[in-house]
Amino acid sequence: MKNALRMLPVLLIGGLAAGEEQAPKPTAAEVAMPSEAELMKIERDAHSGLLLITALVADTPMRMILDTGATHTILHEGSVAKLKKNYFWIDTSHIIFEGNTQQKPKMLAAPLMAGPGISPRHALVVLNLGAVRSMMGEEIDGIIGMDILGSLPFTFNLKQNELYWGTPEGAVLTPLYGTMTRGGRMMVKAKCGSKEVEMLLDTGSAITRLKKGDWEAGVAGEIMAKMGNVNHTTQGKMLEGKPADIEVAEGVKLRNVAPLLEEPGAPVLLGLDALKEAVLIHLPTEGSDYGKFFMMP
């Protein structure tokens, strides 16, 4: 019996700036600064398989999930105490928050370094990520979203475990079917058999999820699935689809995908399990905050 893991730290935010106030400076133990090589490293969590980096928030090392399904970068509220200086709380009284969180978000501004990306004064959403943290093999401090990932080049070759910032030299790139949202997320127009299904490209999800009626291959059986988001975790029996292919780009099929099959209204997600044999590449777009996603045939 398999366990299916699911992270959904998606938050849509409008009207970021609304005034600031100086944050208190909590005391914190000195921590060793990671080397440049460690800051460039992309790894996989031993339990969930999600992608992790060490980022610097206000010059403080933080372990963060790389999540193409998140519009904004999120910091766990318990990790704020690690920050010693050089950050400010943002007045959120006039900010409209939209998304799946049931919490009342806070925000702070701080220098952020994620891989080769540097944002001198980045707005980070502050939430309790206890549910997300409970599903990870190591303690994480937050989530890196498309607000900074959208301006960075990266390659995720899960089959070869080649995860790095940049793109392979001389590679032939095929654009993913679909469109980018206003928050920089990729909505893939995937071909599941004879049906075209819009799916969120979500590296913050370890498992692919579809509506039951959209999976022509049918149901393989029931599995015990543990899923969670920024609010809570749930566990129970869910339907698993029979393995089949999903076409996501011209001449590129994701092989033997076995998604969770759910009722209408549930998120429709293209997760890391579907990318296990694929090479996903993101390139920035000149003059835009967000780039484009490609596959290698």
Can you annotate each of these PLM segments?
Residues 10-18:
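Hydrophobic h-region of N-terminal signal peptides that target proteins for export
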Residues 19-297:
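Pepsin/retropepsin-fold aspartyl endopeptidases
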